Design a protein with these regions (language model features):
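Alpha-helical transmembrane segments of integral membrane proteins
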Residues: 1-67, 321
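Hydrophobic alpha-helical transmembrane segments of multi-pass inner-membrane transport and secretion
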Residues: 13-38, 284-320
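Hydrophobic secondary-structure segments that place a key small or acidic residue at a functional site
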Residues: 125-216
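Solvent-exposed, non-transmembrane alpha-helical starts
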Residues: 67-82, 126-130, 160-163, 203-213, ...
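Intracellular coupling helices
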Residues: 2-7, 305-343
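"Rare, low-scoring activations can occur
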Residues: 170-171, 192-289
Length: 344
């Protein structure tokens, strides 16, 4: 049978050559379409390192001096501080809210802005994204981050961090390639103050469509007075059993009445899930994913139809040959195997 197969292939070498060229071309085009789709799907299914579900972002603002709602007696630092604390207290005691925290410098996962730099381990630089947090503000539990190297988010929230300490993501240890734990390691290049790693968290995907990137979270020891004027964002986490849409509907009605304190008011509130979707759409990731998915399905269907059609045309054009083989005692199963082996 093998000898007969080789003779048949050689006799149809020109036609089979065209078929082979078509298959190679289709395979290349399909791979160009499928490869980014597979990579993006893989990256999207990696652990995020934080929980965007049931997490909301509030943007506060203050009335300008020319506004009708502006109150001059509430505009000094002491009044702003008191009003800010009243607003936070109302927010923390709203039904369904578990944790609240500050988002400093408008930098958070899926934010448009990025701050990066080098985290030095003696003479070894590691490129990191840089975020900031204030200790004892439930930052890690609010964001849903996971501790690493034996730490928990609760322990990190309750720890008395110094301004010379940083929290690093665990994937930085892979960049150092020395197998040593990160916690307690000295930072800097040897001629600076004693900076150290005060905590370690699981790797975080700063972009929902990318793999985790090394992150350093540095410490603000206290809430500085200038932030009562340059107001930070506020993140809040609600109970897991609550519906985000229902909560947001009732919360917006409540905040318009109750969260206007002094010259402060809530400018907007948005879920982190919506922030992720909007960022992916603005970066063209959503359109790219949909386009590649549609083209991938289109080419896959056409590839299956092409293979089936080619097999049908080949067998139809060889009916006379099949009839001759049957007349010489060939069985249908033998002829079927012959055609399949030729295709293989």
């Amino acid at each position: 049978m093998i000898r007969l197969i080789m003779k048949n292939l050689w006799a149809r070498r020109r036609k089979n050559g065209w078929l082979l060229a078509e298959l190679i071309l289709v395979s290349i085009v399909t791979w160009v379409i499928v490869d980014p789709l597979v990579v993006l799907t893989h990256d999207r299914n990696l652990p995020e390192g934080y929980r965007p579900d049931h997490l909301f972002l509030l943007q506060l603002a203050s009335y300008p001096a020319g506004s009708e709602q502006f109150r001059a007696e509430e505009n000094d630092t002491l009044a702003r501080k008191a009003n800010f604390e009243r607003l936070l207290n109302k927010l923390k005691h709203y039904e369904g809210v578990k944790y609240t925290t500050f988002i400093l410098n408008e930098q958070y996962p899926s934010a448009l802005s990025i701050s990066n730099g080098n985290t030095m381990f003696d003479t070894i630089p590691v490129r990191t994204l840089r975020l900031a947090f204030i200790p004892h503000t439930d930052y890690f539990r609010t964001m849903g981050m996971e501790g690493a190297e034996g730490m928990t988010a609760e322990q990190l929230d309750n720890r008395d961090f110094l301004w010379t300490e940083s929290v690093l993501t665990a994937d930085i240890s892979q960049r150092l390639k020395d197998g040593k734990p990160l916690y307690g390691r000295r930072l800097g290049n040897g001629d600076e103050e004693d900076y150290r790693v005060g905590g370690v968290i699981a790797p975080v995907r700063y972009r929902s469509y990318m793999q985790p990137m090394p992150i350093e979270l540095y410490v603000y020891e206290e809430f500085p007075d200038y932030m009562y004027y340059y107001i930070p964002l506020i993140a809040l986490r609600i109970d897991d059993h609550l519906s985000e849409k229902v909560f947001l509907h009732h919360f917006r009605e409540w905040m318009n009445k109750e969260l206007t304190v002094g010259n402060y008011y809530v400018k907007s509130v948005q879920s982190f899930s919506d922030i992720q979707e909007q960022h992916e759409f603005s970066e063209g990731i959503t359109n790219q994913y949909r386009l590649n998915l549609a083209l991938g399905i289109f080419f896959l269907v056409n590839l299956c139809l092409g293979v089936a059609g080619t097999f049908w045309m080949q067998t139809r054009s060889r009916r006379e040959e099949v009839g001759i083989m049957l007349s010489f005692g060939g069985t249908p199963s033998h002829i079927t195997r012959l055609l399949l082996y030729e295709g293989w």
